[in-house]
Amino acid sequence: AEELFLKHGGHPHRDEENGIYCSTGSLGLGITVAVGRALANKNRKVHVLISDGESAEGSVWEALRFIKESNLPNIEVYVNVNGYAAYDKVDVKYLVDRLKVFLPTINIRYTSVNQYPFLRGLNAHYHVMSEQDYKSTL
């Protein structure tokens, strides 16, 4: 895990050699870029990973609706469902049910978020890890 973390970091960056053609920015941006790429080149399969937390963004729902209504066959959407957004928990059952209505072919992947003892409450989002904290996460 440490080797992969050191190689790729915590957020994907443009790395064409490994099939990552776009680095994303704001939440909801990745899926809209993926839809554009799928439209521009219908002979290639496009894969996009979104999260349950970012699914609160309107652009995500607009993109899902567009994929379904346009019958865009060359895009695969994967949702990392860990039950957390930036500052709060996500109602996973409600979200997954709603996602499947918008796009029945959506791929749901359930993951878990480790709860480390040094991360507590809303301030956890802004926690600066000590070296000891960092080593305990690997």
Report residues per predicted region.
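Short, surface-exposed, charge-dense and proline/glycine-enriched linear segments
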Residues: 25-30, 79-81, 129-138
